């Protein structure tokens, strides 16, 4: 199973926020996921990023590939990924 760390869109029309989830790469954007590891709210000023550092590192260590956007969010949150 190819696993990705990606954003799942939530919220109302024109007022989105995103959950950072671990999901099978074949499932739809807002479909089934394995685990929720944080959230991102771009509407607040400044943007809110909350990630569970242990879960992020665990999933990356197990082979999950973060999307480009999630990579940037991980860097902004100050989580070191090795």
UniProtKB/Swiss-Prot annotation:
It comes from the Bacteria. Signal peptide: none annotated. GO terms for molecular function: structural constituent of ribosome. Keywords: Ribonucleoprotein, Ribosomal protein. One of its GO terms (cellular component) is cytoplasm. One of its GO terms (biological process) is translation. NCBIfam families: S16. Belongs to the bacterial ribosomal protein bS16 family. This is Small ribosomal subunit protein bS16. It comes from Clostridium botulinum (strain Langeland / NCTC 10281 / Type F).
